[in-house]
Amino acid sequence: MLYILHENDQWLAPFRETFTEMGLPFSEWHMASFLPDLTVEPPLGVFYVRMSASAHTRGHSGVPELTAGVLCWLERHGRCVINGSAALDLELSKVRQYQALMAHDLPVPLTYAARSPEQLLSLARNMPCPFVTKHNRAGMGLGVERFDGFDAFEIRLDALAETPPVDGVTLLQVYIDSPESFITRCEFIGGKFVYALRVDTSDGFELCPADNCSVPDQHDSSETKILRFEIVADYVDPIIPRYENFLHEQQIDIAG
């Protein structure tokens, strides 16, 4: 039996369809409403964790913390957990992500973390430009905004404070400019590289494949149809083995 721990019905729809077609028995633990009995042994099976750092945007604040406790319960009883507590810990904090990446000599842009507008203003005065803001705990590009200078940031500071990060921590990060308006996202399953996505960033940073993928209609012959996410065939990059080693060391099974 496969148990899926999640908090977003929309994201799970393709999995339901595929697992049903495969004849794979599965049970959903929607962690915003379901609470297992932690005083007994968990059921036998494989537990697949689909918890997201953006849970609070769907009214599910506190659900990742509850899930972290449930994962410790599963792991204590020796259950097979895909993307367990170590993976969730990194999912919920970009600061911890960056520290883990740097510990493996993987490149990370210059980044500062702060908790108050005063701290952000002080840090921004000396930031190389351009730079971006980010929420420490977020998905879908929440809180990401580009600034080309300190004056522009100072003007926007009050507006930024109106949508504070759920954990109270905002990041300032040097913006890595690209000659073209896209990034490449590498997808890993079982800790191994599977495929790459070319992600169109021309319309902003709030990007999530589960929400924004545009699947072309085979009957649509329009040449103007734009895909925000496109699979790149036979993608090769020397950094991929280093990513695979990082995922292995951090006990991350599935990642992008």
How would you describe each model-predicted region?
Residues E7-L110:
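Conserved N-proximal alpha/beta basic substrate-recognition cap immediately N-terminal to
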Residues R50, A114, V199:
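Conserved residues at the C-terminal ends of beta-strands
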Residues P14-F15, R58-H60, S93, L142-G143, ...:
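Short glycine-/acidic-enriched loop or helix-start segments at secondary-structure transitions
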Residues M51, H135, L197:
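Short secondary-structure boundary segments
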Residues E145-P241, N245:
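Phosphate-binding site of ATP-dependent enzymes
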Residues M1, C72, R76-G78, S85-F182, ...:
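Active-site nucleotide/adenylate-binding loops and adjacent lid/helix of ATP-dependent enzymes
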Residues D253-G256:
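Conserved active-site loop/cleft motifs that coordinate metal ions or position small ligands
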